[in-house]
Design a protein with these regions (language model features):
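Outer membrane beta-barrel
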Residues: 45-64, 70-192, 221-224, 370
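Exposed loop/turn and edge beta-strand positions of beta-sandwich/beta-sheet ligand-binding modules
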Residues: 79, 116, 128, 166, ...
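N-terminal periplasmic/intermembrane-space "pro-region" immediately following the signal or transit peptide
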Residues: 18-59, 392-395
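Short aromatic-enriched loop/helix-cap "lid" or pocket-rim segments at secondary-structure transitions
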Residues: 145-147, 196-197, 275
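Outer-membrane beta-barrel pore domains
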Residues: 21-28, 61-71, 109-110, 224-400
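Loop-centered beta-sheet repeat module
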Residues: 185, 189-247
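Bacterial Sec-dependent N-terminal signal peptides
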Residues: 1-22
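Short, electropositive alpha-helical surface patch
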Residues: 112-115, 191-198, 334, 338-341
Length: 400
């Protein structure tokens, strides 16, 4: 026993040295990222012509909240603060990192990343026709609202607001031609454990998924001199043994200055209620033991019209109509519709400096209405109509 202990003690310094080994040594002569961007020359420095940028993104508002027309609260809010680093190291490798400072920083059990890390990936550009993306990335759902940068949106629909769209995995990008693209993606369907995903845990009697992945096929097409854009996708994944999730999502976009118009259709069929919108209705009745709903379906229609009527001014109106239901009875949940919801938005945006596209000041109005069916009322659920008036500022600062 003494000999074993002495042998282990003798090995400890070598183990420590191994842990302290540098993956890249100064003697390797590998240029750093800064050196790839900035080159030294006589009389000073010059910026190399490689694609790289660092952005700081701020989105803040003063909000007045109303319930059924009565003022609830007037306060300031930092909606989003993000740091984004993206660029291309050479002809074959690019990178994308983005961190939000408005989300939890504790690592999740599955991907070992916090939800504050939205992007952390490397792209291998194998050829002009094929790229491979590895790491945390955006789930390749169809639709314009799901795809566009969140800094350009004042409010998501309930569907997109309840889908975890940043997951770790792999994606192949096939570029048939400049206007036709196919994405083939496999990612985790969640970041953490079942207890993190479902507020009342995985339903009793269901075994955990052995392959908790989501596979997506996404087609993007451009037509009419790139003014007409289609984003269609289909996804399938496993939530538990015998319980799957399916997404069918599509976006139909017309974008030609000074107009942007789109119509998105989003549908999910979930063996277990991953969006939790029906599950969250319960818990208000006496003697009810809350459980996670099964066999849920969600459908959303989102329409938007932007009019950039002046170089410094843009206005848009937007609406969404959404339904939530159970497609097969289970436990306390009867088959049928539970929620019909809609929202209406109007926004006026001012760009103080035409050369500074990343800065805008805006006024925004949001109305959200809900109608509960008898299925939901049985659970003593209530969802009042709400309104919000916001004055805000969005500033994307190009640091590099």
């Amino acid at each position: 026993m003494k000999r074993i202990a002495i042998a282990i003690l003798c090995m400890l310094p070598f183990a420590a040295a191994a842990q302290n080994q540098h993956l890249i040594s100064p003697d390797d002569s590998i240029p750093s990222l800064v050196e790839r961007i900035i080159a030294e020359r006589e009389g000073g420095y010059k910026i190399r012509k490689i694609k790289s940028n660092i952005n700081l993104e701020f989105y803040t508002t003063a909000n007045a909240y109303f319930t059924d027309g009565k003022l609830d609260d007037l306060s300031f809010k930092m909606n989003r603060v993000r740091l984004e680093i993206a660029g291309r190291l050479n002809d074959h490798l690019s990178y994308h990192f983005r961190q939000s400072f408005n989300k939890y920083t504790n690592p999740h059990s599955m991907d070992n990343l916090s939800s504050s890390i939205e992007y952390a990936n490397i792209t291998w550009h194998a050829s002009d026709r094929f790229n491979l993306v590895a790491g945390k990335q955006f789930v390749a759902l169809g639709g314009y609202e799901a795809y566009v940068n969140a800094m350009r949106l004042m409010e998501f629909c309930d569907f997109n607001n309840n889908v975890a769209v940043y997951q770790a995995g792999l994606m192949g990008v096939i570029q048939f031609n400049p206007s036709q693209q196919l994405l083939v993606q496999v990612v985790n369907n969640r970041s953490g454990s079942d207890s993190d995903l479902y507020i009342y845990g995985r339903p009793d009697g269901l075994e955990a998924a052995k392959v908790p992945l989501l596979a997506t096929l996404n087609w993007n097409g451009l037509f009419l001199d790139d003014a007409l854009h289609f984003r269609y996708s289909a996804s399938v994944g496993q939530l538990a043994k015998g319980k799957n999730i399916y997404y069918l999502t599509c976006g139909n976009i017309y974008e030609k200055y000074p107009f942007i118009a789109y119509l998105d259709v989003m549908y999910s069929r979930e063996g277990i209620d991953s969006q939790q919108r029906i599950t969250a209705l319960q818990g208000h009745g006496k003697g009810m033991l809350p459980v996670t709903a099964q066999n849920t379906s969600y459908l959303s229609f989102i329409g938007n019209f932007d009019y950039h009527f002046h170089p410094k001014w843009n206005a848009y109106v937007k609406g969404a109509y959404e339904t939530s239901g159970i497609y097969e009875a289970n436990g306390i949940f009867a088959k049928g519709r539970y929620i019909t919801s809609w929202n209406a938005q109007a926004c006026l945006e001012w760009f103080p400096f035409t050369e500074e596209k990343g800065l805008k000041v805006f006024a925004h109005y949001l109305y959200k209405g809900y109608e509960l069916t008898e299925n939901a009322e049985v659970m003593m659920a209530s969802m009042p109509h709400t309104q919000r008036i916001s004055l805000g500022l969005v500033y994307v600062i190009p640091v590099l």
